[in-house]
């Protein structure tokens, strides 16, 4: 859980991150020529600097904070909140300040991590007393999102923002570089950005962790295969494993989806469950039961009192299912449909018992993240883990 320190050069800011932001806007406008995006302001939700790490002539902090700190003065004219507010470290204070500063502004677009942005927008609704966001910001039309999968949050955003003119675009802007943009709103895949100062290589996930894995150059990748992404950049990274797993959906042009994290998976019994499986399973269970998931995490139970093994899921709902058992059954069924390894281990309950679903109390994950000093910014709830460390902490708080 320690911070990672990634070099961010001025050239990298200009030729990678800001260029990616410009291209995201350009692609959106190309797809929506009647857009009035520039009639109002952009609410950009970022992280903060970390003054405890500062040394002479250097600034350490979340990438999003560094981007705000160094943003072009012209772009700064159309951005809210003010810089002092944007860089506040205390997320609860920042959330309240942002809501109060922006409620009376003409916001046309928002950018940030879906989970933390939802928290800010919820505060806006509380302070305004309105039912839907377009009652506060009637001209809102776009959410540029990234950092975590949008699927678990989509329904909540659609309920919060009823406007038929609302659009969503996924971006892949990591601390290490700006890697992808969703250039086609009808396709969830992102276009790999080849000219942002990065060189891409991939390690097949079935070889990841070996001493000498195969490293595939970009021109050698295959579609529908899970890879760990390896990058070298003009900012100083050399064959760096960024920690995300991707699957290419096309190689002409190169388009991909993020399927998970190299450390966030469950393979305690050979089931090879990845985050993409989890997202699909939860989406299906929500569809079947009318539920909405806010946060979740899962880990294996290696052996219970009866000598049985299973997966244990801790789920916080923004809208609870009518029947929790049916939700768990639907999730388990869908995981077997999309993951043959999981299906094999679940066969006749020989290796894996049906999954156990535990309902989290409201606000549990936010309280846990706050306790760990990980509230807001670019911090993410770990979704899947072979270790029970995180889920045990959460279960203790959930009593």
Predicted regions: what they are:
Residues 1-22, 29-32:
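Conserved AMP-binding A3 loop
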Residues 66-399:
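Active-site glycine/GP-rich loop and adjacent strand/helix microenvironment
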Residues 12, 16-20, 37, 93, ...:
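Residues forming well-ordered secondary-structure scaffolds
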Residues 21-73, 85:
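Conserved AMP-binding loop of ANL adenylate-forming enzymes
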Residues 6-7, 55, 122:
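Short, solvent-exposed loop/turn and secondary-structure capping segments
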